[in-house]
A protein has these predicted regions:
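Short, charged, amphipathic alpha-helix that recurs within catalytic cores of restriction-modification
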Residues: 113-126
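Active-site-adjacent loop/helix micro-motif of nuclease/hydrolase catalytic cores
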Residues: 106-116, 145-146
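Surface-exposed cleft-lining segments at the edges of enzyme active sites
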Residues: 5-9, 72-77, 101-109
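Active-site metal-binding core of divalent-cation-utilizing nuclease and nuclease-like domains
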Residues: 36-93
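Nuclease catalytic cores
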Residues: 1-29, 35-37
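Hydrophobic beta-strand segments of well-ordered beta-sheets in folded domains
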Residues: 96-99, 130-138
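Domain-level recognition of nuclease-like catalytic cores that cleave nucleotide substrates
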Residues: 135-201
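Conserved catalytic cores of phosphodiester-cleaving nucleases, focusing on short active-site segments
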Residues: 24, 87-105
Length: 201
């Protein structure tokens, strides 16, 4: 496989993510997968909540109408495109609902994805009827300022490298880091041609 660096990283991620997700599909614990809400549903519920709040204010009817117009303007800015609330994994543990995004690593072209994650995470955090927690599981320990931005946002909880495998073990009961260490030796498992290609790049 003559892969350039970013393409190879993506192929690794395509193998790594479903490998990790198997632990959540067949857990040794009591976690359960769930279907995430649709953005239109979240928007409708929040709009009704705000509308009811405005209706209860002791202000003139014309002022209530104006407030609702301003509120609609804000939604117009946010919803210029369809927002997908679906991430890579959604599961419950007790009363908590976890939203998980898997990343092989954070490279130089993650700005758009970072902005999307900040928006999606913020929406989940503002759904007060549910106790959502947003997690990012990163395979690599070498990442850049985009991941730091997500970490500093307070919206996403980040785990990298061995820390990711520890969280997976805590949630599912599987120690896949130990399994990887015991069963995979990439450089010796690859064909000589593949090994030379990796060392060359």
């Amino acid at each position: 496989w003559e892969y350039e660096y970013m393409a190879f990283s993506r192929r690794v991620g395509e193998l790594w993510e479903p490998f990790c997700k198997l632990c959540f599909i067949y857990p040794l614990t009591n976690i359960r997968l769930f279907v995430p809400p649709l953005f239109e549903e979240v928007k409708r519920n929040l709009a009704n909540e705000i509308s009811n709040y405005i209706d209860g204010l002791r202000i003139k009817t014309t002022e209530k109408v104006q407030l609702k117009k301003y509120y609609d303007k804000v939604w117009g800015l946010v919803t210029s495109g369809e927002i997908q609330l679906e991430c890579d994994l959604h599961f419950t543990e007790g009363t908590n609902k976890y939203i998980v995004d898997f990343k092989s690593g954070f490279g130089s072209n993650e700005k758009g994805n970072t902005n999307r994650l900040l928006l999606v995470g913020s929406i989940y955090k503002n759904i007060e009827a549910e106790n959502y927690k947003c997690l990012i599981f990163v395979r690599s320990t070498e990442n850049n300022h985009y991941l730091t931005t997500l970490h500093n946002s307070g919206v996403w909880e980040i785990s990298c490298g061995v820390g990711t495998y520890e969280r997976i073990r805590d949630f599912t009961g599987y120690d896949i880091h130990d399994w990887i260490t015991s069963n995979i030796d990439w450089m010796n498992d690859f064909s000589p041609h593949m090994r030379e290609s990796i060392l060359r790049n």
